Amino acid sequence: MRRALAPLLLGVGASVAACGYFQGDVGPYRTPAYYEPAQAATGAGPVDQGRQLYLRDCAHCHGADGKGTERGPDLTVGTNGPALTDFVLRTGRMPVEEPPEQMRAREPVYAEGQIAAIVEYVKNEFQPPGPEIPHIDPGHGDLAEGQQVYAEHCAACHATTGIGGALLVHPRQGESKTRGIVIPDFEHSDALAVAEAVRTGPGSMPVFGPRAISDEQLNALVAYTEYLKDPVDEGGAPIGRVGPVVEGAVGWLVGLGVLMLFIRWVGTKAGEQP
């Protein structure tokens, strides 16, 4: 039996050796380059560096010409431009680890210089029609005006305290297209990202151009969203800043609890009398 198996084992060994010879040294498996954006080339000029980063990390989904593929949208139409490109990279929404994955905010995978390089390359190479990166100065924004703009245009989706939440029904798209969409809060977004989102309308968010929200109002709005991150709580404990319903419920529970304890104390005292 052993003699019968010997030629077979020798044949298998020779086949494996031949595969190793033709294949060369076998190293550990590595994911595709577009899943490793942090290891970008940094020695080239801004536009050239942006081209290298784009072709390596973005072209797989958006195409080398920026016209999009079945995995990613066209970058030469709509509000695509410097502001939107900077927004999705600054907030970590791009690049996604898997193309079908829904964009969500996370830590950016690129350094500031790399983001600027990609933005510059996309702008020069594809000439998208979207707006430029807005210039803002939250320190000089009018909080009162910002609160009015926020209440009129933002509070319906992002809540009065800026905590976001689930989008139930979009006024134009209906429930079928908005189910499962979560509106982000402002806690993890800087002022520039908020301004860029206002001007470009990423995802299900509407676009607010200069006619709807002027540059002065935009400056006031981002000043107010920055204030919402750490507002002054004149009434005491914020209770999560989720609104008056929860505050009222807590008030009722605490009030009724104190009242029940008082009634019990009175009843105990009355029972002790001779």
State what each model feature region is.
Residues 44-63, 140-165, 171-172:
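Sequence/structural segment immediately N-terminal to covalent heme-attachment motifs in c-type
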Residues 1-41:
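Hydrophobic secretory-pathway targeting helix
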